[in-house]
Amino acid sequence: MNTVQILVVILITTALSFLVFQLWYYAENYEYILRYNDTYSNLQFARSANINFDDLTVFDPNDNVFNVEEKWRCASTNNNIFYAVSTFGFLSTESTGINLTYTNSRDCIIDLFSRIIKIVYDPCTVETSNDCRLLRLLMANTS
């Protein structure tokens, strides 16, 4: 045998030994690995098979806003109508009125944190309008 063959045999033997030791270590700790996976499986990220699932941790419109008044939030009136509000105004489907109202806070939050392009309606261009008074009331109740 020449030196090249000896080196190849040593390399293959080392690789197989390493593989055997890894498999042995895995088999020895199999119960611990299963317990670990059961304990911490809720912390791992997984894609959902549900098409309608919105991962609210991925997109947050408040990530780059540092002023508390400018952060978007869901606020409700006394009659349980929810609005997505900020000092910029209301989220709406058009820029001429409040067209997005919600019957529960969950729907408001899902719509607020979705990636859909949103239109902001600023009612306070006319300071005396009813919509501007509603916005100020909602902002006073949530800040």
Swiss-Prot record:
PTM comment text: Contains two intramolecular disulfide bonds. They are created by the viral disulfide bond formation pathway, a poxvirus-specific pathway that operates on the cytoplasmic side of the MV membranes.
GO-annotated cellular components: membrane; viral envelope; virion membrane
Sorted UniProt keywords: Disulfide bond, Fusion of virus membrane with host membrane, Late protein, Membrane, Signal-anchor, Transmembrane, Transmembrane helix, Viral envelope protein, Viral penetration into host cytoplasm, Virion, Virus entry into host cell
Main localization, broad class: virion
Cellular compartments annotated: Virion membrane
Disulfide links within the chain: none
GO BP terms in the entry: membrane fusion involved in viral entry into host cell; symbiont entry into host cell
Membrane-spanning intervals of the chain: 1-21
Membrane topology: Single-pass type II membrane protein
Function: Envelope protein required for virus entry into host cell and for cell-cell fusion (syncytium formation).
Family, similarity comment: Belongs to the poxviridae A28 protein family.
Protein name (database record): Envelope protein A28 homolog
Species this protein is from: Amsacta moorei entomopoxvirus
